[in-house]
From Swiss-Prot:
Signal peptide annotation: none
Alphabetical list of InterPro entries matching this protein: SCAB, SCAB-ABD, SCAB-Ig, SCAB-PH, SCAB_CC
Family: Belongs to the SCAB family.
GO biological process, one term: actin filament organization
Gene Ontology CC: one annotated term: cytoplasm
Protein name: Stomatal closure-related actin-binding protein 2
Coiled coil ranges: 112-132
Keywords assigned by UniProt, alphabetized: Actin-binding, Coiled coil, Cytoplasm, Cytoskeleton
Length: 492
């Protein structure tokens, strides 16, 4: 062991005789104490060692970070990944060195502890100037312990920075590898796409060459065929115009003859039907009067020579596609008068009369025709969002109702009956709503309309004209159909 404060050879001999040797398991980094200076407040300041030029861990970390930020924009993705791998290895090495420094620091604390214990033992055995020297050595050992603690704090901070940098470099390395793999996959996809495009273009070029070659081979034949067709057309223009024109005139004459015969056939069929009906009516004591179109009334009356009271007969009306087809009963139509509605257009109207146990049937001469001007009237109303009609309430819930004029509004989503600001009834289109021409007793059946909002609430409305009534029915059914509702009469 080195001497603490030697003066003479005799004192050195006495010290060697008195001081006990230090344990042999303590190892020293050098054979002398490091040099220190006392700064303000008795703080120990290290004197720089000229031989020690190794940079600290903090300086190395700062330098590597600066180099990384400077070269980040200059490096490619692959070079950046390699650089991150190298820095990650360096950071791992620094972490290992920090672990070794922890072991060395622990050995330093053990060494200082044993040295201080030895000096304490020496101080108890010495006196005078030797005691002062030992106390000074103890204070130096304590200062060394404080300095070692400070160095350990700095080392812990550097270790934390190194770990932080290592995690950052590891993450950056993973991101760089991921980016490299992504760019590689993109490049492979582009290469495959370019390869497929090249193959497609090559196939198109080959096909074009084959087509051009085939066209060159077939060129003379095509030209020959074109010449033959042109020659044939020229010959046709020169020699056949009279025959073609004659055939066209013959076709026109044949068409006109067919149309005349068809019209004559229809006329004969109507005459035959009228004759048959007249023959059948000789045995039937009832006659059906009225025009067979919308806006009119079909009225059953007894023949002049029968003398039967029609009011005492049981009557029911039917509609059918033709006289021989299956009939459909018109619910509620049991009077001697019936006004056809738009639902009856194109159909034959029949009526069964039961009198004195005998059943008779009267039929219209043909299907019911639409009224003139009704289609254009409906088309003009469809351009509006709401259409208003002036009506009078004749009945409400089957009871006669004395009423003033009201406004019957047919909209795209609902029907409303109002007078001024007061709304009498309003309802949206639904399956419970019914709307049709009147079928029961009414003063003017051709102008009357039956409207059921819902069960328990019905109206019998009279319009200003037959056309307004039929237009309102067609318009309401069109809007209801757009709402997926079929708006018809009872049991239709």
């Amino acid at each position: 062991m080195t001497k603490v404060c030697p003066k003479t050879e005799e004192k050195r001999v006495v010290s060697e005789a008195v001081v006990e040797p230090i344990s042999a398991d303590v190892s020293f980094a050098s054979n002398h104490f490091p040099t220190y200076k006392l700064g303000p407040d008795d703080q120990i300041v290290d004197e720089p060692d000229e031989d020690d030029k190794v940079p600290s861990v903090k300086d190395v970390v700062g330098k590597e970070t600066g180099d990384l930020s400077d070269q980040h924009k200059k490096l490619s993705v692959r070079d950046l990944a390699c650089k991150f791998d190298k820095n990650l290895a360096a950071a791992s090495k620094l972490v290992d060195e920090a672990k070794l420094n922890d072991v060395t620091s622990l050995e330093g604390h053990v060494m200082l502890k044993k040295l201080r214990d030895a000096l304490e033992t020496m101080r108890g055995r010495m006196d005078g100037r030797n005691r002062e020297a030992v106390e000074k050595a103890i204070s130096m050992v304590e200062a060394l312990a404080v300095k070692l603690t400070q160095n350990e704090g700095e080392l812990i901070h550097d270790k934390f920075e190194v770990k932080k940098l290592a995690s950052f470099l590891k993450k950056a390395s993973d991101d760089a590898k991921k980016l490299v793999n992504q760019e590689k996959s993109f490049a492979c996809a582009e290469i495959e796409s370019a390869r497929a495009l090249v193959m497609k273009l090559g196939g198109a070029f080959e096909e074009q060459e084959l087509c051009s070659k085939a066209s060159r081979d077939q060129g003379p034949n095509v030209e020959k065929l074109v010449e033959e067709v042109q020659e044939a057309r020229r010959i046709r223009r020169l020699h056949k115009p009279t025959m073609v024109i004659g055939m066209q005139h013959e076709l026109r004459d044949l068409k006109s003859q067919i149309q005349e015969k068809s019209a004559y056939s229809v006329k004969l069929q109507r005459e035959i039907a009228i004759i048959k009906k007249a023959e059948g009516s000789k045995s039937c004591p009832y006659v059906l009067d009225g025009a067979q179109s919308l806006g009119s009334c079909l009225r059953i009356r007894a023949s002049s020579d029968s003398g039967i009271d029609i009011s005492k007969c049981s009557i029911h009306w039917y509609r059918a596609a033709s006289e021989s087809s299956r009939r459909e009963a018109i619910s509620g139509a049991n009077r001697s008068v019936y006004a056809p509605e738009p639902f009856d257009v194109g159909r034959v109207i029949q009526a069964d009369i039961v009198s004195n146990g005998q059943k008779f049937t009267v039929t219209t001469d043909g299907p019911i025709n639409t009224a003139a001007g009704l289609q254009s009237r409906v088309e003009s109303l469809l351009r509006k969002s709401n259409s208003e009609f002036t009506v009078v309430i004749s009945q409400m819930n089957g009871q006669d109702h004395a009423s003033r004029s009201h406004v019957f509004t047919v909209g795209k989503a609902r029907i409303k009956l109002s007078r001024g600001w007061i709304t009498k009834a309003r309802e949206i289109y639904s399956t419970s709503m019914q709307l049709c021409g009147v079928r029961g007793n009414a003063n003017v059946p051709a102008k009357a309309l039956f409207w059921q909002l819902r069960k328990g609430l019905t109206f019998l409305l009279t319009f200003e004209s037959e056309q307004e009534r039929n237009a309102a029915i067609v318009l309401a059914r069109t809007y209801a159909y757009d709402c997926n509702v079929t708006l018809v009469g009872p049991d239709d």
